[in-house]
Amino acid sequence: SHVSLRHHPDVMNEPYTFAAIYVKGVENGAKVLEGQVPTWKLFGPAQSGLGRGDKTYGLPRFEEAVFQTRFPFATIDLRDKDMPLAAKITGWSPFIPTDADNSSLPVGVLEYQFTNTSDKAIETVFSYNTKNFIDGQGTIRGVKNGFVLESDQNNSGLAIYVDNAAAVVDHCWFRGAWFDPQTVVWDNIRYGRIADKQPVKGVAPGASVYVPLTLQ
């Protein structure tokens, strides 16, 4: 997904940030909440010969994705034969006709809706995960039910939080070399582990927020 901050339309910017869902007791039951990556993205860019560990392209995603837009809303419906649930994402930002100030608030909302398509209750874990792409050598601050990526050098910041009291936050991914942080995070997701780590002093490679859910 393209991410732009501070009014800079960086439409080719794809930082390592994604939402995922895990379903307990289901083979291949962990998926990024996105559709398939177009094959043209996989070849040619810088460092693609090293496997593109800076991208999420290699993580499993939903087989089917249907996109619709009705400004200021956009919706994506996700389905996959491996998953006993359907997912719907609704994205929007404030838009009030004739109210320029409130329509310009630096806020974006992603609403995730899950529907149990099986005949029994299922236990799941939703997560939102991101590398510290604001400042790779910076810290990550905590907020209620979320975290804040920020940088003193360029006066930038990004807060991510969920509206759910059951949220658990991992404020600091595993601090290792190469792609160790990403590997550990994906292992947490695919095994249904919920990491609970408080903010730390010093470098924090990334952060995650987890929400356990039971779907009837």
Regions found by a protein language model. Give the residues of each.
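Beta-strand-rich N-terminal accessory domains
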Residues: 1-44, 66
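Exposed beta-strand and adjacent loop surfaces of beta-rich binding modules
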Residues: 2, 18, 84-86, 121-123, ...
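A short, compositionally biased
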Residues: 14-17, 68-74, 141-145
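Eukaryote-specific, cytoplasm-facing alpha-helical/coiled-coil scaffolding segments in long proteins
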Residues: 18-19, 48, 136-138
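Short acidic, glycine-rich loop/turn motifs
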Residues: 25-27, 78-83, 151
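Extended, loop-rich substrate-binding clefts of extracytoplasmic carbohydrate-active enzymes
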Residues: 43-107, 174-211
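Polysaccharide-binding surfaces and accessory modules of carbohydrate-active proteins
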Residues: 89, 94-188
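Short Pro-Gly-centered flexible turn/kink motifs
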Residues: 122-124, 206-216
